[in-house]
Amino acid sequence: LLYNYDSIIEDETDTVILVEGVFDVIALTRKLNLYNNPSVAVVATFGKKISDTQIYKLQAKGVHTIVIGYDGDATEAIKKTGDQLNEYFDCYVADIEDSSQDFDSMDFWEIYDTFAFRLKTLTEYKLNKIQI
């Protein structure tokens, strides 16, 4: 089950932003005005993990790129989900700077900065999170 899965148009939606919950979907769709943009969809996994069935559903729709937009405090879940998705999709992470925030609590400019300046490949994200 993926919330807002129906917004993915087969072979037309190229990029999916994957978030944890319903309010994140609503917030991103509204704040980025994605209502009439068939090439990008925001969907929720209802938590910090993704199942093989959910991955298959995304593949079946012809999605090529996944941006993981889990909450800032979900570092380990992002790494694990990224490893699962990286096998099948071009996978990126929207690295939320403040670990206490999510897209629902962020304003437009904070979201813009996250996607414009903090979008990372999975490898970049993992390297950035190494504690020395």
Predicted features and spans:
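TOPRIM fold recognition
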Residues: 13-14, 25-132
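Glycine-/acidic-rich phosphate or pyrophosphate-binding loops and their flanking alpha/beta elements
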Residues: 1-13
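Helix N-cap/beta->alpha junction signal
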Residues: 19-21
